[in-house]
Each structure stands twice: as structure tokens, then as C-alpha cells.
């Protein structure tokens, strides 16, 4: 196409992202249950949905921060390209957008897995495997569509729906923690 390519980065990034999200979310609820601080947190006058959403947002923001080195990669390729600046910025922007949406879904699934167990290791393994299966079966097509530069509203709605569904189910499960 005559442009410097950054495709390799965006082909491997989802596989790394599913592990990063599983690692960031494994402690969200599993550690609280394991240490017994979940009941103390629930005794505070804070709505359950606020606790879950804030935990999700904290992990999601950290995941997005973890994506910032990709921007550094863009500028390196930008300045190293012949002639300088000969890189498809639209494809890069679409790919970054795809990674942000993918991280929203992976973070939600990882948080959901953390609500299911009291062990951080089990939460990590369950989150990584769930993210892998979800990516392989469903998310890969939506992600590859966005990385080609085609930002379809259906893809965006799908990623947001996965994240919201995971948050809602996490709220329902978190409400049952300690009542067993």
C-alpha cells in the first residue's frame, strides 16, 4: 500500500491484552473474599453497583494506560518511515480504538471471573481462558473489522454490550457473596 505498517503490533496485542486484563482483574473480588474485607466493604453505605462499577473502571483505566506504549510505537514508525510520516494514521487510530473496545470487554469478563472464585490464581486462569475463548469465537471478527479502519456501529455496540453484560452479571454475583 506504500505506507509503513504497524499491523504486527495489532495482531499480537489482543493476545497480550487478554493476559494483562486477566492479571489486572484477578484481585478485584477474589482477594476481597479471601481476606474477608468484602463484608467490611459491603457494610459501608455505598451501593453495590457503585462498588462494582468503580472496580471495573479502575481496572479498565489501568488497561488503557497499558496501551499507551502503542502510541510510542506509532511515533517511532512515523519518524523512521521513508519518507518520514509515510504511515496510515487512520488505520492506527482504528486499531487503537479496537484495542480500547477489546480491553473493555476483556476487563468485564476478567472481573466477572474474579467474582466467581475466592482464589486469585483461579480467577486469573479462568479470566485468561474465558477471554481467549471469547476472542477466538466472537470478538476476533469484530476486532479485525475495526483494525481495518471500518468502524461499524454494530461492532462498537457489541463490545460495549459484552462489557455491560459482564458488569451486570458481576453485580448480581457480588450481591450474593457472603449470603451463602
How would you name each of these model-derived features?
Residues 1-4, 116, 123-180:
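Terminal transmembrane helical anchor/hairpin motif
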Residues 1-7, 54, 58-121:
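Secretory targeting signals
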Residues 8, 23-24, 95-99, 155, ...:
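Residue-level signature of transmembrane alpha-helical cores of multipass secondary-active transporters
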Residues 8-31:
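Long, hydrophobic alpha-helical segments
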Residues 13-21, 64, 68, 100, ...:
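Residue-level signal for the membrane-embedded core of alpha-helical transmembrane segments
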Residues 21-25, 37, 73, 108-109, ...:
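Hydrophobic/aromatic residues in alpha-helical transmembrane segments
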Residues 28-58:
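Helix-loop-helix units of permease transmembrane domains in multi-pass membrane transporters
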Residues 31, 43, 75-79, 115, ...:
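Transmembrane helix-loop junction
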Amino acid at each position: 500500500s506504500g505506507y509503513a505498517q504497524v499491523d504486527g503490533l495489532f495482531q499480537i496485542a489482543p493476545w497480550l491484552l487478554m493476559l494483562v486484563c486477566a492479571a489486572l482483574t484477578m484481585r478485584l473480588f477474589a482477594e476481597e473474599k479471601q481476606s474477608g474485607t468484602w463484608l467490611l466493604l459491603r457494610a459501608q453505605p455505598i451501593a453495590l453497583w457503585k462498588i462494582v462499577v468503580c472496580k471495573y473502571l479502575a481496572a479498565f483505566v489501568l488497561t488503557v494506560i497499558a496501551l499507551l506504549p502503542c502510541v510510542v510505537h506509532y511515533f517511532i514508525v512515523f519518524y523512521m518511515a521513508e519518507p518520514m510520516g509515510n504511515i496510515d494514521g487512520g488505520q492506527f487510530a482504528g486499531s487503537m480504538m479496537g484495542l480500547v473496545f477489546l480491553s473493555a470487554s476483556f476487563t468485564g469478563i476478567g472481573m466477572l471471573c474474579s467474582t466467581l472464585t475466592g482464589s486469585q490464581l483461579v480467577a486469573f486462569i479462568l479470566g485468561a481462558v474465558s477471554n481467549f475463548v471469547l476472542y477466538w469465537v466472537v470478538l476476533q471478527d469484530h476486532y479485525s473489522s475495526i483494525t481495518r479502519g471500518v468502524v461499524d456501529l454494530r461492532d462498537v455496540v457489541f463490545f460495549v454490550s459484552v462489557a455491560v453484560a459482564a458488569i451486570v452479571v458481576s453485580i448480581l454475583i457480588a450481591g450474593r457473596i457472603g449470603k451463602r
